[in-house]
């Protein structure tokens, strides 16, 4: 496991990025200067409009979201979002082969 030094920015993958915990964690990490990759399938377990509103707050426009493609935040240069399903093994392997978290 890598040691994290004080004042070192992290690169973090957050699953459930549009949910309550994921959204607030994203905001906190972005506020301290970390690089955040948000991942969410945007299912209808609860209000989908609330999930999209949270994504809008971090600069991800609903109409720019494309399945299995990263969307760059218009507010935070250090935030990208991808709509994908954690059960899509091929897509998850692709994400981890392209980036190191």
Model features per residue range: what roles?
Residues 1-101:
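N-terminal Rossmann-like NAD(P)+-binding domain of SDR-like oxidoreductases, especially those catalyzing
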């Amino acid at each position: 496991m890598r040691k994290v030094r004080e004042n070192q920015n992290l690169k973090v993958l957050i699953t459930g990025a549009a949910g309550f915990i994921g959204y607030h964690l994203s905001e906190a990490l972005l506020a301290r200067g970390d690089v955040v990759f948000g991942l969410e399938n945007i299912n209808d377990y609860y209000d989908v409009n609330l999930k999209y509103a949270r994504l809008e707050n971090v600069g991800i426009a609903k109409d720019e979201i494309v399945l299995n493609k990263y969307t760059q935040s218009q507010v935070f240069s250090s935030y990208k979002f991808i709509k994908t399903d954690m059960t899509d093994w091929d897509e998850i392997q692709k994400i981890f082969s392209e980036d190191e978290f």
